[in-house]
Swiss-Prot record:
GO molecular function, one term: ATP binding
Function: Involved in lipopolysaccharide (LPS) biosynthesis. Translocates lipid A-core from the inner to the outer leaflet of the inner membrane. Transmembrane domains (TMD) form a pore in the inner membrane and the ATP-binding domain (NBD) is responsible for energy generation.
Residues engaged in binding ATP: G375, H376, S377, G378, S379, G380, K381, T382
Subcellular location: Cell inner membrane
PANTHER family found in the cross-reference section: ATP-BINDING CASSETTE SUB-FAMILY B MEMBER 10, MITOCHONDRIAL, ATP-DEPENDENT PERMEASE MDL1, MITOCHONDRIAL
Span of the signal peptide: none
Protein name, per record: ATP-dependent lipid A-core flippase
TM helices/strands, residue ranges: 23-43, 56-76, 141-161, 162-182, 257-277, 278-298
Stretches assigned to the ABC transporter domain: 342-576
PROSITE patterns for this protein: ABC_TM1F, ABC_TRANSPORTER_1, ABC_TRANSPORTER_2, MSBA
Top-level class of the enzyme under EC nomenclature: translocase
Free-text domain note: In MsbA the ATP-binding domain (NBD) and the transmembrane domain (TMD) are fused.
Length: 588
């Protein structure tokens, strides 16, 4: 699913401009302001000739008296158009970044689950924050500097040609050499910029993992290891940044050297060809001033090239992400709740074209009944639970909901029918009320409280200083494991979907809490089709059907008592837990 093919610069520019196009009126105003700014600068250079010639050679007192007014008007106008141009270009850039960030985030949210299995949160954050910001530099700072300086270069060259085209042509001979230097550094900076982006993703990833897993890091004494790993990543990032800096230095120094040679050639020509080329002192000094002024914009343009290449590398990374296919979301839209009858027909599944995890899985869950999945680790329990809401697409076979293949239903319609409570509870840095009402944003406070009571969460919520308006911190860090689990259960209760998936839903609770939650879940499960994955077999004894999986195949199925009477795989697992025997090979 990864797309790392290089995109040609022309296509990148064209695609990037499609994001700029909606803001073209402001962009045009900014471009015109920057052109006027450069024109004023070039005009001042031309005025140098007039100032010198009419002030000291052919004295023109009327013109001399106007010089202060010309300077005042020119500098004032220059300042105004500079501010206007800068504001317009920055406005366009930040608008592009806003749209691009929103587009990237929306795309990431709708990517298939198997993309998340490979990509890390650090890499994704780096794309949203760092790579998109590089694009901003292309569409704002780089574009502003490019327009200002390229117009200034054109203006100064025009001034030189008007004053003395013969000497100006000599200077133009240096342009091809400047092009050779810029072309070399272009390729080098673009290549290194890809490495910089990759290392930024690694730095973000390492920091994110260490911060999120700080308890494990500390209890296992991994501080030095994490610091060393982070330092290595930042050092590698620094080295790549220095490679870019070296390329910039070579670029700038080379261009300055070429320009210096050009200036020296013109001075020599003016001295040795004085009998052929007639030029006034003012004209000669104006040409020299123009050439000296050319150094700064030429230097900026060559330095700017590195910024543009970094921005294009960032754009390439972002567009590669945007080119990844989204979840297939075409199908029927269900207007009403389903009854909840689920059937797996000859289901096979493999992750990323690897070996099959599931082999010819067949079973039926009658509407309103509960089915529990048990088996060794890696037997396919979680895979089955993930296939039902189409987190992954089937490799082979069919899953039906009320007789309709789930592939023929829209994802939104299908997932509206399902609630999920998993072992790894996800809470957002928001209030308890908003966490319970996640996905049901129109729920009233009374409905939220009712759901919390059914999940036995209302009691501890009332004891908090702000009650239901208490913020839970990042991923519910301010709550205990049992409290987080109860909030997740309350969220599922409030959704009131006809299908319920319980993936180790009571694993994080103490015995007393589990007793109450189990009672609450039994009430919630009534009338709902429930798929249960549980570690403790004692919690699934009352399931209508228990399915035993081994190596992706169904080896037994029946009620709790029926499976005990078979004295097979399930009976062995149950006895191990019932009598507290330790068997490391058995993980249910």
């Amino acid at each position: 699913m990864k797309n790392n093919l290089p995109i040609k610069s022309r296509l990148l520019y064209k695609r990037l401009l499609s994001y700029v196009k909606p803001f073209w009126p402001v962009l045009l105003l900014g471009v015109l302001a920057n052109i006027l700014y450069s024109g004023i600068d070039a005009g001042f250079t031309y005025m140098t000739k007039l100032f010198l010639d009419k002030s000291f050679i052919t004295i023109d007192l009327d013109f001399v008296k106007q010089i202060p007014l010309i300077v005042l008007i020119g500098i004032t106008l220059r300042g105004l158009v500079s501010s206007l141009g800068s504001y317009c270009m920055t406005w366009v850039a930040r608008s592009v970044v806003k749209v691009l960030r929103q587009t990237v985030f929306s795309h990431i949210i709708h990517l298939p689950a198997d993309y998340y299995d490979e990509a890390t949160s650090g890499q994704l954050l780096s794309k949203i924050l760092y790579d998109v910001e590089q694009v901003a530099q292309v569409s704002a700072d780089a574009l502003t500097d490019f327009i200002q300086n390229i117009c200034l270069v054109i203006g100064l060259l025009t001034v030189m040609m008007v004053i003395c085209w013969q000497l100006s042509l000599m200077f133009l001979l240096t342009i091809p050499f400047v092009g050779i230097i810029v072309n070399y550094t272009n390729k080098r900076v673009r290549r290194i910029s890809h490495k910089v982006q990759k290392t930024m993703g690694e730095v973000t990833e390492i920091a994110s993992e260490a911060i999120e897993g700080y308890r494990v890091v500390r209890i296992f004494g991994g501080e030095r290891y994490e610091i060393t790993k982070f330092n290595k990543a930042t050092e590698y990032s620094r080295k790549n940044d220095m490679k870019v800096a070296i390329s910039k230095a070579i670029n700038v120094s080379g261009v300055q050297l070429v320009i210096a040679i050009g200036i020296a050639m013109i001075i020599m020509a003016a001295i040795h060809l004085s009998t052929v080329i007639t030029i006034s002192a003012g004209s000669f000094l104006a040409i020299i001033a123009a050439m000296l002024q050319l150094i700064k914009p030429m230097k900026t343009l060559t330095t700017l090239n590195a910024t543009i290449q970094r921005g294009l590398a960032g754009a390439e990374s972002v567009f590669n992400l945007l080119d990844l296919p989204l979840e297939r979301n075409n199908g029927l839209i269900l207007k009403e709740k389903v009854r909840g009858e689920i059937e797996f027909k000859h289901v096979y599944h493999a992750y990323r074209q690897s070996q099959n995890i599931l082999h010819d899985v067949n079973f039926v869950i009658e509407a309103g009944t509960s089915v529990a999945l048990v088996g060794h680790s890696g037997s396919g329990k979680t895979t089955i639970a993930s296939l039902l809401p189409r987190f992954y697409e089937l490799s082979q076979g069919m899953i039906t909901l009320d007789g309709m293949p789930i592939q023929q239903l829209s994802l939104e319609s299908l997932r509206k029918q399902i609630s999920l409570v998993s072992q790894n509870v996800t809470l957002f840095n928001d209030t308890l009320a908003n966490n319970i009402a996640y996905g049901r944003f129109d729920a009233s406070r009374e409905q939220i409280i009712t759901a919390a009571k059914l999940a036995y969460a209302d009691e501890f919520i009332k004891q908090l200083p702000d009650g239901y308006d208490t913020r839970v911190g990042e991923n519910g860090v301010l709550l205990s494991g049992g409290q987080r689990q109860r909030i997740a259960i309350a969220r599922a209760i409030l959704k009131d979907a006809p299908i319920l998936i319980l993936d180790e839903a009571t694993s994080a609770l103490d015995s007393e809490s589990e007793h109450y939650i189990q009672a609450a879940l039994e009430q919630v499960m009534k009338g709902r089709t429930t798929l249960i994955i549980a570690h403790r077999l004692s919690t699934i004894k009352h399931a209508h059907k228990i399915i035993v999986l081994q190596h992706g195949r169904i080896v037994e199925q029946g009620s709790h008592q029926e499976l005990l009477d078979m004295d097979g795989h399930y009976a062995q697992l149950y006895k191990v837990q019932q009598f507290g025997r330790i068997n490391e090979e058995v993980v249910v």
